[in-house]
Amino acid sequence: MNFETVIGLEVHVELKTKSKIFSSSPNAFGAPPNTQTNVIDLGYPGVLPVLNRQAVEFAMKAAMALNCEIATETKFDRKNYFYPDNPKAYQISQYDQPLGKNGWIEIEVNGKKKKIGITRIHLEEDAGKLMHTGDGYSLVDFNRQGTPLIEIVSEPDIRSPEEAYAYLEKLKAIIQYTGVSDCKMEEGSLRCDANISLRPLGSDKFGTKTELKNLNSFNFVRMGLEYEAKRQEKILLSGGVIRQETRRFDEATKTTVLMRVKEGSEDYRYFPEPDLVMLYIDDEWKERVRASIPELPDARRKRYVEEWGLPEYDAKVLTLTKEMADFFEATVANGADPKLASNWLMVEVSGYLNSEQKELHDIALTPESLAGMIKLIQNGTISSKIAKKVFKELVEHGGDPEKIVKEKGLVQISDEGALRKIVLEVLDANPQSVEDYKNGKDRALGFLVGQVMKATKGQANPPLVNKLLVEEINKR
């Protein structure tokens, strides 16, 4: 029997407001434990929450960017559960009247585009963070308690781990472009839980789902879903039954491990938050927030193709993160050829960032210095090969590319007389390669070019070298 995988994702995104959602405590990552919390966050008797207007507007902005309908009336509810990181024994969330609903985003996998529905987006407060000491104790850091969150719940439209990965990439890009969150998974400002079930191929009835947690990277989401699909398939093929449960992805074994039997929404005993009034959002407020939404990834991608003639693939890669897209545009604004700028960012810059495990803002390279180096390639001062030496200096130490080229003696040799002399020496030293080229073996010319480049320490002008070699060979 063949099965179809059905996946839905729940993504929590921390909003980067200056203060928390219901209190004046600062909202910043990395402070010493329990230094960014107050009596409201900790649920002391008699204290009352006050809703952060900026958090509401950030949530609206994200929901609009994800094509959601924005509620005219919405409210907050208490989600009741006991856990050490939840000091009030309830979480202020939204239950039956979310801020946004019926949204969608478009993903692309293997060249095929597909819309993934978004059921709802709602606002809630984050919980504290448990820190396990390893000697039998657990400590609680309440700095995160009360941080404003949006939970983005997808429709069960995702049919493979690859689609889940593409959905998360696109969702992250859109949220980052709006500026409401930095979406750093390593800091917990973007977290994902996945629901997965299997059903017989062709059936429209959903199977029993399991929820996956501890998915700390997009790759772990993909690996966790791949493993869980195989685990469920094995159970079903052997005549077993899937239980509704919550499982944890184990990073060491790359498997999923049972955490608990899954609770239903009735277990949380939701009821309206008595300390917060209904929230009314009129059309004027909606339009003001909508007007603040910047150009989003798809629009930018289209503009790069139409305005600068970039291939679709290049435009897609460059717009995947706002930081890369901004860097690219600034490089072009400083006079670099768009296609050359695209190539350098996609190959050399991205390669360096991946190998060093860094972000663009961590390196010394600037759009101005990259543009300056590209202009040196364009005007023939340096070759692409020499440019890689300049790039290494710029990315590690920064500086003026023109000054680096002069100080290190990297100016490309374009003097025809000087190069012709070297070409003749190379031809005299390699008569067999000359003969091979004359006999139709084009590779021989590449070898001879390499010998000239070697003799000039890579500083010869490659097109001129090719021209001179062909001229001199034809004379022999």
From Swiss-Prot:
It catalyses: L-glutamyl-tRNA(Gln) + L-glutamine + ATP + H2O = L-glutaminyl-tRNA(Gln) + L-glutamate + ADP + phosphate + H(+); L-aspartyl-tRNA(Asn) + L-glutamine + ATP + H2O = L-asparaginyl-tRNA(Asn) + L-glutamate + ADP + phosphate + 2 H(+). Pfam families: GatB_N, GatB_Yqey. Keywords: ATP-binding, Ligase, Nucleotide-binding, Protein biosynthesis. Transmembrane segments: none annotated. SUPFAM superfamilies: GatB/YqeY motif (SSF89095), Glutamine synthetase/guanido kinase (SSF55931). Its EC number is 6.3.5.-. PROSITE patterns: GATB (PS01234). It is an enzyme of class 6 (ligase). One of its GO terms (molecular function) is asparaginyl-tRNA synthase (glutamine-hydrolyzing) activity. One of its GO terms (biological process) is translation. Allows the formation of correctly charged Asn-tRNA(Asn) or Gln-tRNA(Gln) through the transamidation of misacylated Asp-tRNA(Asn) or Glu-tRNA(Gln) in organisms which lack either or both of asparaginyl-tRNA or glutaminyl-tRNA synthetases. The reaction takes place in the presence of glutamine and ATP through an activated phospho-Asp-tRNA(Asn) or phospho-Glu-tRNA(Gln). Heterotrimer of A, B and C subunits. PANTHER family: GLUTAMYL-TRNA GLN AMIDOTRANSFERASE SUBUNIT B MITOCHONDRIAL AND PROKARYOTIC PET112-RELATED, GLUTAMYL-TRNA(GLN) AMIDOTRANSFERASE SUBUNIT B, MITOCHONDRIAL. Belongs to the GatB/GatE family. GatB subfamily. This is Aspartyl/glutamyl-tRNA(Asn/Gln) amidotransferase subunit B.
